[in-house]
Structure formats: structure tokens, C-alpha cells
């Protein structure tokens, strides 16, 4: 019997704003970066380049704790990366401020959202507290290192095909984490930075965006 799955039937596109990335003094590398990825991070900061991905410590902690919780059973986890897309000196980058997830159906090598939990997921996204954009997704590879499988790559191509979309993969057993984006027929790793809390600046919160969800039978 086909299992109903949700589809976003209405969305609002916003122009990409010119915004400076988080200050360099607020940036730090993830503790689980490989030597190669750490070298790319250091080189980018030394040159003053704009990274393609900045992630709040709050969002990183949620992802890491979720992955670590299921690591003893070697179960994969997943969720959405919520944030904003900006441009600075001609470079488009994404800022992840929070994550969204719900009940999952997972094993040591596969994971997907529980279809019955989609309504709660979208309600939680609406209550996120800021005018978010889906800037990518994350999932774990417990004990399998960090890469995009054929299934992961297909997911990226069909659902996250914009230049700013990121696939974040975390291995809680090997203490590894990497960020990827599409490149040609495949994908490439991109350096990313974590940033700490912002000082209060008096800006008003953005309006919440409501997503209309309609059940659609999967083929």
C-alpha cells in the first residue's frame, strides 16, 4: 500500500541579501575535523576567503548529540539545516542557525523520516522562531566514515540542488564530520566554520513562514 508523503505546494522566494559573514574572532573549527579538512579551514581563514557554510554552535550541538545518542545502536539520524542565504563580495554562502527533525525509521545504513510524523515536523519548523530557509540536510554514518552514497547523492540532486545547499555528514563513532555540495556529476567537500552566540543587536525577528503541506501518495 502506498505510504502518503508530504509535498510543499507553496513557497515564497526571497532575494539574497548582502550580509557580512560572522566575525572571524567568533569562528572556530569543529573538533572532529580531519587533518585535511582542518588545513582547508585554516587556509580559508588565513586568506580571508568567505566560506560557503557557517554553522551556529547551537545547531551543531543538536546534530552531534542526536547522532551520539543513537551511535551505540549504530542507527543513522537525519534532519534539515535551517538558516539563511547571503552574499558577500560576490560569494554566496549559507548560515545554519538551527535544525529540524522528527521521528525516524532508521538502521545502520538507511534512514528516512517517519511519514506519520511529518505534520509535527512542519509544525515544529513553523515554530522555529525565525524566517528560515532550508539550506541543506544532515545525516549520520555511524562507523562508516563521512561521504555521500549513491542514495545520498540522488537525494542531494533531487531535493537540494541549489549552489548553497549543503549535505552535512557526521560519524559519531569515528569522530568525523564533513560538509559536501554538488559539483559536476558528483560532489565535493567544502570547509565550514562554527560560530558562537551573537551579541544582541535589537533587530526584529523575521516573520514566520507557513508551509502548506498536502499528502501525496508515493509511487
Set out the residue ranges of the language-model regions.
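Conserved beta-strand-loop surface patch within small alpha/beta domains used
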Residues: 1-134, 143-219
Amino acid at each position: 500500500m502506498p505510504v502518503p508523503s508530504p509535498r510543499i505546494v507553496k513557497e515564497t522566494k526571497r532575494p539574497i541579501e548582502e550580509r557580512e559573514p560572522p566575525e572571524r574572532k567568533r569562528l572556530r573549527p569543529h573538533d572532529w575535523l580531519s587533518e585535511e579538512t582542518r588545513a582547508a579551514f585554516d587556509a580559508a581563514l588565513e586568506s580571508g576567503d568567505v566560506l560557503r557554510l557557517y554553522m551556529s554552535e547551537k545547531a551543531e550541538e543538536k546534530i552531534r548529540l542526536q547522532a551520539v545518542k543513537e551511535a551505540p545502536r549504530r542507527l543513522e539520524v537525519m534532519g534539515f539545516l535551517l538558516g539563511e542565504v547571503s552574499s558577500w563580495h560576490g560569494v554566496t554562502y549559507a548560515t545554519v542557525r538551527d535544525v529540524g527533525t522528527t521521528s525516524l525509521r532508521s538502521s545502520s545504513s538507511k534512514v528516512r523520516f517517519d511519514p506519520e510524523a511529518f505534520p509535527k515536523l512542519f509544525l515544529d519548523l513553523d515554530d522555529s522562531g525565525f524566517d528560515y530557509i532550508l539550506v541543506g540536510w544532515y545525516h549520520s554514518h555511524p562507523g562508516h566514515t563521512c561521504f555521500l552514497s549513491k542514495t545520498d547523492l540522488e537525494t542531494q540532486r533531487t531535493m537540494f540542488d541549489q549552489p548553497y545547499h549543503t549535505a552535512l555528514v557526521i560519524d559519531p563513532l569515528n569522530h568525523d564530520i564533513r560538509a559536501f555540495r554538488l559539483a559536476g556529476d558528483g560532489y565535493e567537500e567544502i570547509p565550514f566554520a562554527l560560530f558562537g552566540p551573537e551579541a544582541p543587536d535589537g533587530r526584529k525577528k523575521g516573520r514566520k513562514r507557513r508551509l502548506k503541506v498536502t499528502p501525496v501518495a508515493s509511487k
